[in-house]
């Protein structure tokens, strides 16, 4: 009974009368032969859109106002909190690896690209024997740096890591701070995602509710 009601309503629908809000569009037939396609292209060319695009190109050539940079000879500056290839920090006191092998970064990684192997040393303290990050799977979300209790893993500014070999994307020693950089005192600490960039007070307008 229900199906018969639906069929009756479908057959009695009004599809002939058009509302005043609608109007018929005169669609030109699609050309099927070569001459028809040629005439259609000619009509589109002399309509004006082609000359508008050519005028824009000619105008920018005369102005010599270049809006691009010559990469890789020129590079755009990167913010201090840009999330690029990871950096593994060392301790300032002993120059040893700061990672304690807690495994929080491995647990929170949503792309499952961090692997940590640990063991107990002669003093029954946990020691990291293997730490690897598969950059081919990493989405650079920053959760590993945010959850690290020792600020051992951070994001750096190195983004040129293209390669045609997958094994090149699994690295650790390349991310560890070099000893000469530690001795020079140039290792940058992680300011945190909630911290503002340096000299930001000069550019940010303070409000009464600023904290």
UniProtKB/Swiss-Prot annotation:
It comes from the Bacteria. PROSITE patterns: 4FE4S_FER_1, 4FE4S_FER_2. It is a peripheral membrane protein. GO terms for biological process: aerobic respiration. Keywords: 4Fe-4S, Cell inner membrane, Cell membrane, Iron, Iron-sulfur, Membrane, Metal-binding, NAD, Quinone, Repeat, Translocase, Ubiquinone. Binds 2 [4Fe-4S] clusters per subunit. GO terms for cellular component: plasma membrane. Its EC number is 7.1.1.-. [4Fe-4S] cluster 2 binds at residues 109, 138, 141, 144. PANTHER family: NADH DEHYDROGENASE [UBIQUINONE] IRON-SULFUR PROTEIN 8, MITOCHONDRIAL (PTHR10849:SF20), NADH DEHYDROGENASE UBIQUINONE IRON-SULFUR PROTEIN 8, MITOCHONDRIAL (PTHR10849). HAMAP family: NDH1_NuoI. NCBIfam families: NuoI, PRK05888.2-3. NDH-1 shuttles electrons from NADH, via FMN and iron-sulfur (Fe-S) centers, to quinones in the respiratory chain. The immediate electron acceptor for the enzyme in this species is believed to be ubiquinone. Couples the redox reaction to proton translocation (for every two electrons transferred, four hydrogen ions are translocated across the cytoplasmic membrane), and thus conserves the redox energy in a proton gradient. This is NADH-quinone oxidoreductase subunit I. It comes from Sulfurimonas denitrificans (strain ATCC 33889 / DSM 1251) (Thiomicrospira denitrificans (strain ATCC 33889 / DSM 1251)).
